[in-house]
């Protein structure tokens, strides 16, 4: 299921420092496919990765390594990596937690667009009330149990 139906976005990005942005984005598919299938599909995978990278606004940074990217750019790279497998659901763990409020809002706008345009379900963990109120539904947990379920305003 992971790497097919689910994409993961982490607070701390988890980009591989020795790989370029493009290589980080295609890494999940390199793991998914056998060597034979990888080589047969590599051109299509490369084209799809570039399309996604451009969609998240990083087309000009495609050959850069994570150390050459800002926090917001690294989070956009992580989102691109999560999208490469064409998941139905994105699981986002504090995707704005390491970002300033302006960049965090840019990431939220990008995620909202993905939800609306691509009909992706996004399940997000956050402690930030300003971020939570942008969701369609808010589920609050306490001590590992569902406390409330509300439609957002």
Regions of interest found by a model, annotated:
Residues 1-143:
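ABC family nucleotide-binding domain
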Residues 38-40, 150-153:
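Short, flexible cytosolic linker that couples an ABC transmembrane/permease module to its adjacent nucleotide-binding
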Residues 143-151:
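Conserved switch/coupling elements of ABC/ABC-like ATPase nucleotide-binding domains
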